[in-house]
A protein has these predicted regions:
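Metal-dependent nuclease catalytic cores that hydrolyze phosphodiester bonds in DNA/RNA
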Residues: 2-224
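Mg2+/Mn2+-dependent nuclease catalytic core
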Residues: 202-293
Length: 293
C-alpha cells in the first residue's frame, strides 16, 4: 500500500454553496440536515472518545439538565424578544418533568390521558417496562405543574424549568446582563457616534467543501454551524464571532490545558470551523477579503 500524505489532500470551500437560514434548533438538528457535519457530531467518530462510523451515522439524541440550562440561557440572553422564562411552577425534575411536558403537548394533539402518558414515557425513556404501575405516581407528582402550565399564557416561546434549574438560569442571565463587557460584545456600537453595529443571533450557516486527493476529486463534505452571535462593523471592517458557553465549574478552569472544557469539548476545533465558515459567508455575501478588509 502506498503512503498517504496529508499534503496530498486539498480542501476547497465552494463559496456558491454558502447559505444562511433562519431555523429553530429542532430543525437544525433534524434528519433534514443530518448529512451536514457539525463540531459536536465529530466526537461520535473520534476513537479516542469512544466514537465509531456506526455511532456517527446514528448519533444519540442526548437531553441532560446541563443542556437544558445552557439552551435556556442562550435563548433568553440572545433572543429576549422571542423567548422568556416561565415563573416557577413546581415542575418535577429530571425525566419526570420531561414526561409531563410531553404529555402536555400530546394532550393538545388530542391524545387521551392514558395514551399520552404511555407515549411520553416511551419517548423519554421513563420506566418503559412498568408504565402502568407508574401512572398514578406520574399524575400525583406532575398534576400541579401540568395545571399551572395549562393556565399560563404568553405571546413568546416560553421555557419551563424546574424550580432549581430556574434559579440557575435566572442567576446566569442576571449576571450576563449586568456585565458591560458581555453586553458590549453582544450589542456593540461604533466608537464615533454610538450607533448600533449590525448584530445577528442564532444564524444557521451551511457550506460545502470540495476535497481532492492528488488533485482528483475525493469527496464533498457538508458542514453546518449555529452562530450564537456575530457582528459586522462595515466602517471599521471588523467581523466578530461570539460563542456563549455555560459551565458549572469555576470560570478559571475553562481554559485549563488538561481538564478544561476548552480541551475536553474541542472548542478550539469549533472556533476554527465556525470562524472559517462565517468568513466564507461574509466573503460571498459582502465581498470582503482578508487583504483589504
Amino acid at each position: 500500500m502506498s503512503e498517504i500524505k496529508f499534503s496530498d489532500f486539498q480542501v476547497i470551500p465552494i463559496l456558491d454553496s454558502v447559505k444562511k437560514l433562519d431555523m429553530s434548533d429542532e430543525m437544525y438538528f433534524s434528519n433534514k440536515f443530518a448529512q451536514y457535519i457539525s463540531n459536536s457530531r465529530l466526537k461520535n467518530i473520534n476513537p479516542n472518545e469512544g466514537g465509531s462510523p456506526q455511532l456517527y451515522k446514528n448519533p444519540p439524541r442526548l437531553q441532560t439538565t446541563s443542556l437544558a440550562i445552557g439552551s435556556a440561557v442562550h435563548e433568553c440572553l440572545l433572543q429576549p424578544e422571542e423567548f422568556e422564562l416561565a415563573p416557577k411552577m413546581n415542575k418535577p425534575t429530571a425525566k419526570l418533568g420531561a414526561v409531563v411536558d410531553e404529555v402536555f403537548k400530546l394532550r393538545k394533539k388530542g391524545y387521551s390521558i392514558y395514551n399520552a402518558i404511555h407515549t411520553a414515557c416511551e419517548k423519554i425513556g421513563y420506566y418503559v417496562n412498568s408504565i402502568d404501575k407508574k401512572i398514578p405516581s406520574i399524575i400525583e407528582k406532575g398534576f400541579e405543574y401540568y395545571w399551572k402550565r395549562h393556565k399560563f399564557e404568553s405571546t413568546k416561546d416560553t421555557i419551563f424549568l424546574s424550580d432549581s434549574d430556574y434559579d440557575v438560569v435566572k442567576s446566569c442571565l442576571d449576571s450576563c446582563n449586568a456585565n458591560k463587557q458581555i453586553t458590549s460584545k453582544l450589542h456593540p456600537v461604533d466608537n464615533l457616534f454610538g450607533d448600533p453595529i449590525d448584530s445577528y443571533n442564532e444564524d444557521a450557516l451551511f457550506i460545502d467543501f470540495l476535497v481532492t486527493y492528488k488533485k482528483k476529486h475525493c469527496v464533498t463534505l457538508k458542514f453546518k454551524m449555529k452562530a450564537d452571535n456575530w457582528t459586522i462593523d462595515h466602517d471599521a471592517k471588523v467581523i466578530t464571532l461570539n460563542d456563549l458557553k455555560t459551565t458549572g465549574k469555576p470560570v478559571g478552569w475553562f481554559m485549563a490545558p488538561e481538564y478544561g472544557s476548552m480541551v475536553k469539548y474541542h472548542y478550539n476545533r469549533q472556533m476554527a470551523a465556525y470562524s472559517s465558515i462565517l468568513w466564507y459567508y461574509c466573503q460571498q455575501q459582502f465581498g470582503v477579503c482578508k487583504n483589504t478588509g
